[in-house]
UniProtKB/Swiss-Prot annotation:
One of its GO terms (biological process) is translation. It comes from Mycolicibacterium vanbaalenii (strain DSM 7251 / JCM 13017 / BCRC 16820 / KCTC 9966 / NRRL B-24157 / PYR-1). GO terms for cellular component: cytosolic large ribosomal subunit. It holds the Pfam family Ribosomal_L27. PANTHER family: LARGE RIBOSOMAL SUBUNIT PROTEIN BL27M, RIBOSOMAL PROTEIN L27. The gene is rpmA. This is Large ribosomal subunit protein bL27. It comes from the Bacteria. Keywords: Ribonucleoprotein, Ribosomal protein. GO terms for molecular function: structural constituent of ribosome.
Length: 88
């Protein structure tokens, strides 16, 4: 049984701020060491070559280079491949 507040309740109207998760640097982009590549909850993407994983599962570049996404044994990986001056 409802007890008053039939139309629109003043008890509503709250929401949490978005977590801003997702891929921050896409395939082919050139990054510097320390740049965040993916913000995630859990390991949707796994760290590959020259990529580190933070305590909150954030993936970051450990060396400069180009971002490369790939799959290995059913897992998605993020790698950083070194680029020469001519390619960059």
């Amino acid at each position: 049984m409802a007890h008053k507040k039939g139309a629109s309740s003043s008890r509503n109207g709250r929401d949490s701020a978005a977590q801003r998760l997702g891929v921050k640097r896409f395939g082919g982009q050139v990054v510097k060491a320390g740049e965040i590549l993916v913000r995630q909850r859990g390991t949707h993407f796994h760290p590959g070559v020259n990529v580190g994983r933070g305590g909150d599962d954030t993936l970051f570049a450990t060396a400069p280079g180009a971002v490369e996404f790939g799959t290995k044994r059913g897992r998605k990986y993020v790698n950083i491949v070194r680029v020469t001056r001519a390619e960059a």
